[in-house]
Amino acid sequence: MEKKNCALATMKDVAKVAGVSTATVSRTLMNPDKVSAHTRQKVENAVLEVGYYPHNLAKNLRRNESRAILVIVPNICDPFFNEIIRGIEEAAAQHGYLVLIGDCKHQQQQEHAFINLLITKRIDGMILLGSNIPFDVSKEEQKNMPPMVMANEFAPELELPTVHIDNLTSAFNATHHLQALGHKRIACITGPESMPLCQYRLQGYIQALRRAGLPIRDEYIIRGDFTHESGAELAEKLLTLTNPPSAIFCHSDVMAIGAMWQAKKMGLKLPEDLSIIGFDNISTAQYSDPPLTTVAQPCYEIGHNSMLLLLEQLQGRMVSKGSRLLDAELLIRGSTCSPKS
């Protein structure tokens, strides 16, 4: 069923598409916990399909008076997102928009809350800071969603306007820096395999090794989850190998700091015994001991540009589904040096 452009959709339209009574539609929207999950899903899908909005919000539909946007964050506790959110909030405030934050870490519990925000038109648009979206944007019945922009992550299959860096080249440069110092046994602590940016960073690492004629050693590639704990745990596994690495490239500063802590706990001197390089340049990276060499992402600019891109859509401008690529920089600090002879 196509979205009604000439007149606002009614509750009767929703009921017809969902195959339920108007009373059930009303009950689902007013008291969603009073109906079964199956019924709620049917009604929510129908609401999105026909473009229905509750009567008391209908006047705001055309005037776009919500003035709020939703930022969906993979993990609100990850310090990497702080500057991105600040960039979004400052750009939003300059244009009179309020920013709501949605933590996607507990996706199952949050899915209905996010869908409800869409249904009731309490947000005008969304900025996604990861590729793990808490609903299926590909479904035909959900084409009435508000404008969306993807920031930080790059997932071309979603066909969304995107602001991000070149993760593959940045990872290549980080690995090449270790090679230029003379390291040949370089390990990689990656992020989750499900995240496209981690796949690009891993490919950058692999390409750098191949370009230098070094072997790709499976035992040197190990997956983490962007936490200090995983960085420490996986560093211990790498450093207890029969032939441990002399350097570790981590997909995030948080994991790199965890790896540094573990290496020092095991009695290693940094960077003399082990070089470690991170990714992101979070605020604490320069204060670690030693200061962390890392790939600096322009986090504030990613957030600021993503909000400006969303504003273009909210103002009715046509926005390309392509990406806006920002520059990253390798910051060489004290956690890397040439290996011992």
Task: State each model region's role.
Residues 236-341:
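Flexible loop/turn connectors
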Residues 184-185, 216-220, 270-275:
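Short acidic capping loops at alpha-helix termini that bridge into adjacent secondary structure
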Residues 22-27, 61-77, 131, 177, ...:
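Short beta-strand segments enriched in small/hydrophobic residues
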Residues 74-83, 101-110, 163-173, 189-234, ...:
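Hinge/beta->alpha junction and helix N-cap segments in small-molecule ligand-binding domains
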Residues 105-106, 128-173, 194, 214, ...:
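Flexible loop/hinge segments that line or gate small-molecule binding clefts
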Residues 52-117, 121-125, 203:
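Amphipathic helical "hinge" segments at domain boundaries
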Residues 1-65, 337-340:
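N-terminal helix-turn-helix DNA-binding module of bacterial transcription factors
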